[in-house]
């Protein structure tokens, strides 16, 4: 297998367990986020959903990847995650099965994203839930955002990527 060149070269299991190739969103702008249901940043689900609703028809796809590596803040199984997101934040953007984003067991997409767009001070590791990666229509990462960056603060970059 050749080394991945774009985000579209990866796949991951959805919350329903079915394999979801990211190539189904080829040519779209992707906002890839590690999410959690019991985190201080969990209210960002509302902002992520708003971005999806405001820009989805213009070519943005928000992709949520639950992760339980930070303070055991995503302890639920797939059904619990789905129900929480739907009932609490009316999430309709694509959600995936739980992944690891750091360490030897990190999902290959997340290993690649970190290698392509390292964090502050050259430290690649994901620091906490709700780290975000904006990926351009060409499948290449444009920018990495910290958990403290609220979804609405990404609008200018998203609009530029969609232009």
Which sequence ranges carry the predicted segments?
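Chalcogenol-based redox active-site neighborhoods
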Residues: 1-163
């Amino acid at each position: 297998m050749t080394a991945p060149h774009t985000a579209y070269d990866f796949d991951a299991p959805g919350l329903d367990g079915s394999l979801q190739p990211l190539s189904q969103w080829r040519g779209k702008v992707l906002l890839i986020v590690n999410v959690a249901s019991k985190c201080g940043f969990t209210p960002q689900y509302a902002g992520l959903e708003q971005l999806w609703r405001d820009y989805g028809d213009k070519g943005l796809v928000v992709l949520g990847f639950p992760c339980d590596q930070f303070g055991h803040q995503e302890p639920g199984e797939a059904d619990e995650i789905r129900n929480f997101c739907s009932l609490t934040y009316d999430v309709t953007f694509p959600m995936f099965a739980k992944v690891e984003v750091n360490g030897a067991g990190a999902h290959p997409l997340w290993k690649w994203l970190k290698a392509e767009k390292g964090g502050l001070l050259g430290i690649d590791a994901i620091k906490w839930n709700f780290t975000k990666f904006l990926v351009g229509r060409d499948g290449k990462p444009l920018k990495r955002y910290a958990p403290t960056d609220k979804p609405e603060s990404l609008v200018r970059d998203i609009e530029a990527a969609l232009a």
